[in-house]
């Protein structure tokens, strides 16, 4: 997942600022996608005070999903402390027995700077214990990192290891993982280019593995401003490159316009892309059952071919992934249905998936989460803020 400020129209690319209502809708959609194993905050709602935004975002995810929730972006010690408290309430985990309530990401400033405020928050949460930390550098080749991919990956590696070394110095044994976000640059404009084949992610995953660290790398990326053919081929190529290295986590789902915005349709299409890419990199069975010679003889001799065999019925679904929105019917049926494209199908699918009710949290947990937000707001002196109970009541 990413962390974007805007909602984009999938056909025109026009932007508007994301709201708390958008965060709720997108969380509900992500919960119901088949390839979304972990949920993290996708948008920064502008109608929430910035100092409290991670807390509201976590509350939204907790109310909308019972999947594992990754922590939102953290900038201050107050945010980090409150998120850990909220996650402990939701999960019941406290770090004992190797089970942790949440992971929190901390970003160095490239090149090779550990910012004071973020570093203080990272140290405080590590010394408190009971949390997993991700070191998340975001260098850009040719601007905040060298232009050569090898050199840029080496700098990024040093930035991650600096964070790891600091964590293990102040709180030995703190679980930590590797979050590379190295991006390319368009030499014609100087803008960040997200649609290029991101081969650096393979290098990053291998470097992380060499150090014994789990890796969260980017996969689905694109520079396209709308959901068009460019969006599809760039995201499919980069998802495949990302998964080829076998990272522990693959990020980027739902982002459009090089990570500047998102939309529900992008999430649905990305889910279809991931269905195909995950199938492509998964090993196919070559055991005795898959290569059953008796079944081959039966199919060859049968007047109905192989379709009538139990073997075919058993394997047809696992061997041939079924798309949620991709079209596989005949041309005549497609023409008769009005020539609907994948964006239309994705919009319809998103509507179906978000029509259900929120998963919700127990009432006592919900009350405690809201009190944590209110207490944090009081300590920070934030008087004007949305009522968090409206999120739990489905009134946002």
Which residues are covered by each model-predicted region?
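Hydrophobic alpha-helical bundle architecture
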Residues: 204-308
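Short acidic (Asp/Glu) and glycine-rich catalytic loops that position anionic groups and cofactors
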Residues: 101, 140, 182-185, 215-219, ...
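A diffuse structural propensity rather than consistent per-protein peaks
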Residues: 16-19, 115, 263, 287, ...
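Short juxta-domain linker segments that transition from a proline/glycine-rich
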Residues: 1-2, 22, 31, 275-276
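Helix-rich catalytic cores of soluble enzyme domains
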Residues: 14-248
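Glycine-rich, N-terminal phosphate-binding loop and its surrounding beta-alpha-beta segment
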Residues: 1-10
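Catalytic-core signal marking the mid-to-C-terminal active-site face
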Residues: 265-396
């Amino acid at each position: 997942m990413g962390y974007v400020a805007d909602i984009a129209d999938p056909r025109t690319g026009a932007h508007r600022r994301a709201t708390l209502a958008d965060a709720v809708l997108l969380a509900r959609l992500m919960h119901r996608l088949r390839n979304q194993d972990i949920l993290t905050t996708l948008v920064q709602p502008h109608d929430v005070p910035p100092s409290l935004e991670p807390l509201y975002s976590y509350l939204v995810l907790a109310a909308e999903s019972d999947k594992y929730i990754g922590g939102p972006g953290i900038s201050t010690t107050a945010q980090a402390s409150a998120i850990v408290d909220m996650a402990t309430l939701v999960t019941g985990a406290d770090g004992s027995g190797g089970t942790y309530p949440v992971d929190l990401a901390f970003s160095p400033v490239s090149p090779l700077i550990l910012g004071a405020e973020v570093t203080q928050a990272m140290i405080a949460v590590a010394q408190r214990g009971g949390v997993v930390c991700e070191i998340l550098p975001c260098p850009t080749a040719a601007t905040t990192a060298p232009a050569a991919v090898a050199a840029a990956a080496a700098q990024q590696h040093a930035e991650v290891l600096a964070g790891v070394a600091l964590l293990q110095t102040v709180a030995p044994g703190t679980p930590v993982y590797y979050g590379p976000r190295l991006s390319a640059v368009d030499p014609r404009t100087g803008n960040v280019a997200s649609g290029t084949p991101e081969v650096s992610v393979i290098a990053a995953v291998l470097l992380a593995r060499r150090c014994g660290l789990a890796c969260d790398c980017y996969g689905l990326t694109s520079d396209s401003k709308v959901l068009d053919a460019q969006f599809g081929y760039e995201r499919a190529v980069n998802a495949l490159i990302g998964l080829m290295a076998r990272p522990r986590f693959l990020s980027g789902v739902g982002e459009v316009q090089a990570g500047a915005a998102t939309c529900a349709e992008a999430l649905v299409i990305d889910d279809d892309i991931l269905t195909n890419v995950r199938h492509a990199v998964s090993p196919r069975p070559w055991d005795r059952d898959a290569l059953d010679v008796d079944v081959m003889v039966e199919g060859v001799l049968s007047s109905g071919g192989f379709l009538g065999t139990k073997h075919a019925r058993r394997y047809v679904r696992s061997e041939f992934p079924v798309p949620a929105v991709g079209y596989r019917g005949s041309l005549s049926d497609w023409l008769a249905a009005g020539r609907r494209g994948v964006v239309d199908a994705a919009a319809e699918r998103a509507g179906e998936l978000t029509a259900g009710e929120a998963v919700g949290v127990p009432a006592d947990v919900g009350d405690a989460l809201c009190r944590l937000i209110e207490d944090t707001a009081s300590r920070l002196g934030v008087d004007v803020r949305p009522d968090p109970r409206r999120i739990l009541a489905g009134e946002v």
